[in-house]
Amino acid sequence: MARTNFDMLLEAGCHFGHLKRKWNPAMAPYIFMERNGIHIIDLHKTVVKIDEAAEALKQIAKSGKKVLFVATKKQAKDIVAEKATAVNMPYVIERWPGGMLTNFPTIRKAVKKMTTIAKLMEDGTYGNLSKREILQISRQRAKLEKNLGSIADLTRLPSALFVVDVMKEHIAVKEANRLGIPVFAIVDTNSDPNNIDFMIPANDDAKDSIEVILNACCTAIAEGLEERKAERADEKAAKEQSEEAEEARPRARRARKSDDASKAPVAEEEAPAAEEEEAPAAE
């Protein structure tokens, strides 16, 4: 079953591309027509691409891996933050830190520094510093929190990148390509889809367009997380059942040995009685 349909995308304005003079020829297969100098995207193909991307994202989430969402353009920031947070995925909506992926250990150090400062503020050590030091640390923490707060839980490289505007986030796309990390992206008619593993041809400027696509993709991620949770619960139940069965076996063996031991004296008492009955016959 399709996660979106033609009417939903049409209502959200997903079909509006850029001016003809700004187009990228690589997007030609996804352009339906030109109207008033603006390219119109073929939404039937968009529906198919959304389903492909959503299924892949679902499998990534089901395997317990992370998808990093990237959207630093104004109209996409709040939507991405909301949707990514809802499915417990990391995101970048401020300036993309250069080397975020290719120099990940350095980024992790900055995140740890931010965590250390937070602990200083919580355990009371912060109060023993001078006003100047407190001001410097507060500013440093605010800067780190703004740029890296949303990736604080990202302890290793993400398994995929989801980008809203591939032209604006070209550095993030290049870093992901360099490391072989799959890239999912909303690609408009002015962008190059060649470096994108799962491209979704659609309007990447309108809020409604961005939201309807993110809804479909994040719903798929949520489904993957639920399936993973259910599988782990089943595995836990099976493990507990197996452990109970293992514990039951020694008890059953002990019970059998106890029964055998209680029957043995009875057999020995019957044996002499049988000999006494046979003795007169022998004389």
Regions inferred by a protein language model and the residue ranges of each:
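N-terminal cationic and glycine-rich segments that engage phosphates or anionic surfaces
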Residues: 1-66, 72-73, 77-120, 131-134, ...
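Residue-level signature of catalytic and energy-coupling elements of molecular machines
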Residues: 13, 69, 161, 213
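Short His-Asn-centered micro-motif
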Residues: 70-73, 163-165
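Glycine-/small-residue-rich active-site loops that bind phosphorylated ligands and cofactors
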Residues: 75-76, 168, 205
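Long, charge-patterned amphipathic alpha-helical coiled-coil/hairpin "stalk" segments used as oligomerization
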Residues: 87, 92-194, 202
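Short glycine/threonine-rich loop/turn motifs
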Residues: 171-234
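D/E-rich low-complexity acidic segments and tails
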Residues: 241-246, 261-283
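Intrinsically disordered, low-complexity Ser/Pro/Thr-rich segments
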Residues: 254-262
